[in-house]
Amino acid sequence: MSMNNNRTITLAWTGASGAPYGLRLLQCLLAADYQVYLLISSAARVVLATEHGLKLPANPEAAQAALVEHLGCASDKLVVCGKEDWFSPVASGSAAPKQMVVCPCSAGSVAAIAHGMSDNLIERAADVVLKERGQLLLVVRETPFSTLHLENMLKLSHMGVTIMPAAPGFYHQPQSIDDLVDFMVARILDHLGIEQALVPRWGYDQRVRGE
């Protein structure tokens, strides 16, 4: 894969509920012609199979082939990395993309990233983005939040990390679960600076029913 940090991004899926968010975000990033390094935790594969019915092999190359077939995307735009692939570009500040999204992000991943852990490639990639002053978005899916969860998120926010709880809005009058997923993915794309038209934007011409 050729390295172009301006059109390259790291996406991580962890074991939190919300696999459809991560899959839809991947689809949109690829459609926007981004090269995506995808990091998948073992728990994320279980959640993806449970919530979406998509069973990915543990082998990174096989998982990549399965996703390319499932999404119908170009094979050269997606690289699935092993959880201990320390030779991956995302593991080094000299080669890693400047943007990273963890979606969905578990509370455990929030804690590990907040405290600089690098026990797997997801944590290391996040640590690299932080030390290189890149853009890190965490789409946290947990409820309720404990005091410890909130303290970890506050710590990360002070570091410049964008904390985006997976809490879709309803003012666009969603008609399906896909509409709710698109709302969150649209907000993520907005923060990444990627054009999107997944949901109508709020504006003065928007009518609110019931008035």
Swiss-Prot record:
Family: Belongs to the UbiX/PAD1 family.
Lineage: Bacteria, Pseudomonadati, Pseudomonadota, Gammaproteobacteria, Vibrionales
Role: Flavin prenyltransferase that catalyzes the synthesis of the prenylated FMN cofactor (prenyl-FMN) for 4-hydroxy-3-polyprenylbenzoic acid decarboxylase UbiD. The prenyltransferase is metal-independent and links a dimethylallyl moiety from dimethylallyl monophosphate (DMAP) to the flavin N5 and C6 atoms of FMN.
Protein name: Flavin prenyltransferase UbiX
Annotated positions binding FMN: G15, A16, S17, S41, S106, A107, G108, S109, R141
Catalytic activity, reaction form: dimethylallyl phosphate + FMNH2 = prenylated FMNH2 + phosphate
The enzyme's E.C. designation: 2.5.1.129
Gene, per the UniProt record: ubiX
Keywords linked to the UniProt accession: Flavoprotein, FMN, Prenyltransferase, Transferase
InterPro entries: Flavin_trans-like, Flavoprotein, UbiX-like
Amino acids binding dimethylallyl phosphate: Y171, R187
Major enzyme class: transferase
GO terms assigned for molecular function: carboxy-lyase activity; flavin prenyltransferase activity
A Pfam short name: Flavoprotein
HAMAP family: ubiX_pad
